[in-house]
Amino acid sequence: MAQEIFSIAAVFWILIPIGLVGGALLLKFQGD
């Protein structure tokens, strides 16, 4: 159970920054 929670948390730690950076880049390119 704990390992499953840890793996899910790791996925979020990786995906959230990628999503934030990707969203910021999209807004930046659309702004141009």
Swiss-Prot record:
It is a single-pass membrane protein. The keyword Chloroplast does not apply. The 4 large subunits of the cytochrome b6-f complex are cytochrome b6, subunit IV (17 kDa polypeptide, PetD), cytochrome f and the Rieske protein, while the 4 small subunits are PetG, PetL, PetM and PetN. The complex functions as a dimer. Belongs to the PetM family. Keywords: Electron transport, Membrane, Photosynthesis, Thylakoid, Transmembrane, Transmembrane helix, Transport. Component of the cytochrome b6-f complex, which mediates electron transfer between photosystem II (PSII) and photosystem I (PSI), cyclic electron flow around PSI, and state transitions. It comes from the Bacteria. The chain crosses the membrane at residues 9-27. Its main location: membrane. The lineage of its organism: Bacteria, Bacillati, Cyanobacteriota, Cyanophyceae, Synechococcales. The keyword Nucleus does not apply. GO terms for molecular function: electron transfer activity. This is Cytochrome b6-f complex subunit 7. It is found in: Cellular thylakoid membrane. One of its GO terms (biological process) is photosynthesis. It holds the Pfam family PetM. The gene is petM.
